[in-house]
Amino acid sequence: MGTNKKKYLTYLAWFGFVLAFLMLARYLSFHVEAELDADLASDLVFAEYVSEEKNPVPTGWCYSTDLRVLNTQLIFAPLFYLIQNWHMIRVVGTLLCLAIMIGSYAWLAYNLEVSYFPVMAVLFLCPLSKEYIYVVLCGAAYTPHITISFLTVGTFLYLWKHSIREKKNRIILLFLELLSFGAGLAGYRQLLVCYIPFMITVGLFWMFSPKNKEYLKLVMLAMSALICAMVGNFVNTRWCMTKYNVTNYSLIHLKDFSFDRFEMVINGWLSNLGYKSDVDLFSAEGLFGNAFFAIIFLTVGAAILSAWKRQKQYYKKQMLVMVYFLCMAVVFLMLYLFTDVYYESRYLLPVTIWIVPVIAILFQNENKKICTVLAGILMVFCLITAFSYYNRPIINPNEEYENMAQILQENNMHESYATFWHANLLTEISNGSEEVWHCEIQNDQFMIQNVRPWLQKKEHGLRTPEGKCFILLSKEECDELAFTKKQKKSHVLYQSDQFVLYGFADYEELAEYISQPLR
């Protein structure tokens, strides 16, 4: 390929990357609220609390299953000092998280010695699947886990080929160990995503390579990082659990093999890659949407098959990453097949995202002309998919929260109750003006006395709301509760097909109202 033509294609690829980034930025600016839910909103509410406490991992928060150490609050929290608008904080913070994630891939790609970076960057920004859009492109929730994995493996490969005796490389080794400790300190997740699969991978290479001495250094590096991660995890289980409110993984149990779980995981990966089921085969979504899935699926399959057949042609570090990808998949598959751990298809994304370096390795080692054409086709499909998704007719399912937030502000109501599914979402959409305690419904009772210790401030369990109060419920929740069946409707501030909003002069009136017997 001529030099001028190569430059032209490179510029074109970078233009595609900039275009993909701008399309995403525009979509987030105008429509990100349509993608939000309680889980994603909880991240921003937590980040605001971090900025308020001036502590990156505050003890006054009720965490979920992971202690948030190296997580999105490190990006979002400082923005609260610079920007007053929660919507803009969401947009800017998400774009920064994505930029850091793509930068971490650049470090991995540099050490893998693979090209096609702008094409792979476009793939990162492509609305590949509903799961990827939700927790990466719009929520940025999984960007820390992906970033840590890319940084860790990239650093492994760098130190493998460079002398640790040099001062610069000793600093990089220290960075790797601190990163591993911080990742383990958050909980078990990153051990399963990164450190255990990589240790298995290098162990296999060390055992089965005829020149196993060359892998000994990598084994030592992997062991060092794994030990640091395990020490972090030990601190998490032995000390952090006594200081922080975090859900314990001890509730997970071993179970018998289940074909249902196997089918569930396989379908989850297909969904992660963009496969669209339950659509008409000959519809635009069925044909074009699944055509893009087929391109991704076949390219990944070709990459694995090519690496298997032409092992000698590939750099050893590239083969290492190919096997690591498979080891991650096996570890996750075993986790869901033989335990009762809760499953959502999005939990597979930290594994699925490794298709990007896998595809880059394929393009680097096969026929350049063919791979350049394939890279071009991949980029075009990514851009068309992005344009189609970002410009589709959009119905915002959260629009009513804006209306209710305005009503609450007009009535000077800023603290009160809802279930988890509405509480933090209302806080974010109201630009932080509404602080909402979330509690559970048990039998037919709204349990305001038992505030749920999950993704909210601990102080919510220690004090009651002040001033005028409200209760926000969905129609379905209303149908479950005893107090909503009363004939008295004077406390209803807002009612629609989806929500009912009750208003009260103070907490005492609220508590009395929901505890009164039926009339």
Regions found by a protein language model. Give the residues of each.
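Signature aromatic-anchored transmembrane alpha helix within multi-pass, membrane-resident enzymes
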Residues: 3-19, 168-178, 223-227, 292-295, ...
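Transmembrane-helix motifs of polytopic, lipid-linked glycan transferases
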Residues: 7, 19, 92-116, 151-155, ...
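Membrane-proximal lumenal/periplasmic loop motifs of glycosylation machinery
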Residues: 29-38, 51-77, 87-88
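Membrane-interface micro-motifs in multi-pass membrane enzymes
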Residues: 65, 69, 112-160, 341-355, ...
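Short periplasmic/luminal acceptor-recognition loop of GT-C membrane glycosyltransferases, typified by
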Residues: 66, 410-447
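Hydrophobic/aromatic-rich transmembrane helices and adjacent perimembrane loops
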Residues: 141-148, 192-193, 287-298, 319-367
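Membrane-interface alpha helices of multi-pass inner-membrane proteins
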Residues: 170-189, 197-199
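Luminal/periplasmic acceptor-recognition loop/helix of membrane-associated glycosyltransferases
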Residues: 433-519
